[in-house]
Amino acid sequence: MAFPWRRRNKPGTLRAAESDDARYLSEWVSTRRGIEGFVEPRTAVTDTTMLLVAVDGEWTRRRVPSVEWAHNFANKNGIPSYDAAVVGYPDRMREWNKRQKEL
């Protein structure tokens, strides 16, 4: 049985990182403290992304143009950056997610 609302033979396209994403990341960095950056490599379904985690575990993720761009962004903003595939994610992020679910 075919589902008429499903598209066939039309591959999806990834949305590129935009200046809005860069602006959002800059604003986020300026309004939080103790931030670390985690650069996530491109996958089959997502472009390269940057995950920012604040000292309290609050986090945000946005697409970025490249791995190099993400590390340069972190350096310019004085925050450490790591390759997420190598170091993983901080426990405080998981703890923050858990606290948010309990609210």
Question: Can you annotate each of these PLM segments?
Answer:
Residues 1-103:
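Intrinsic disorder
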